């Protein structure tokens, strides 16, 4: 079974945002980190937003962030939501468009392949995005995410209501 690029990119966006933490990331940053087309990512991000997994903030200072509950999503949930087809062979087709096979009435291969697919999803369902994003420090450096520097303002001196004076 091979996942589509769309699903691959969806998982990558979700992992990037999970590692990114607080603050907003941009599609351009994610594109640069993975070397993926920005246009492809725009489609992916739109869908992730529609699913309610990613908060998309529009505007000049906009960007993306993962909703906290999304860290509890399993890889299987993401794959199921972003893949269109899990038919491993023609006789699995759900839309009735199966290719006729002369051995279908006696075929045991279909059951073996169905069990393999189910085992694949069982494994994906064991892992959450939050689990895969930890420890974030190793992924942060690989993805080129720069930590946000927090600058704390100095408290004003007690009894002083005036701002600090400039040195002449």
Regions found by a protein language model. Give the residues of each.
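Short amphipathic alpha-helical elements of helix-turn-helix/winged-helix folds
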Residues: 13-20, 81
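A short alpha-helical element within helix-turn-helix/winged-helix DNA-binding domains
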Residues: 27-34
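Beta-hairpin "wing" of winged helix-turn-helix
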Residues: 52-61, 65-67
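C-terminal regulatory/oligomerization modules of transcriptional regulators
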Residues: 75, 93-168
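Key DNA-contact positions within bacterial/archaeal DNA-binding proteins
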Residues: 39
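Short helix-capping/hinge SLiMs at alpha-helix to coil transitions
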Residues: 18-22, 68-69
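Short, hydrophobic-biased segments on the C-terminal half of alpha helices
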Residues: 14, 45-46
């Amino acid at each position: 079974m091979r996942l589509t690029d769309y699903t691959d990119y969806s998982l990558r966006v979700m992992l990037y945002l999970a590692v990114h933490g607080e603050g907003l990331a941009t599609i351009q940053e994610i594109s640069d980190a993975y070397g993926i087309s920005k246009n492809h990512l725009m489609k992916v991000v739109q869908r992730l937003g529609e699913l309610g997994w990613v908060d998309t903030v529009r505007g000049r200072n906009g960007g993306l962030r993962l909703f906290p509950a999304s860290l509890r999503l399993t890889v299987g949930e993401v794959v199921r939501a972003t893949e269109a087809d899990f038919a491993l062979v023609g006789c699995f087709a759900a839309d009735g468009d199966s290719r006729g096979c002369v051995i279908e009435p006696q075929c045991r291969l279909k059951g073996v392949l169905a069990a393999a697919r189910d085992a694949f999803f069982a494994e994906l369902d064991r892992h959450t995005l939050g689990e895969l994003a930890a420890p974030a420090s190793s992924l942060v450096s690989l993805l080129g995410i720069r930590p946000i520097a927090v600058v704390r303002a100095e408290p004003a001196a007690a009894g002083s209501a005036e701002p600090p004076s400039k040195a002449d």
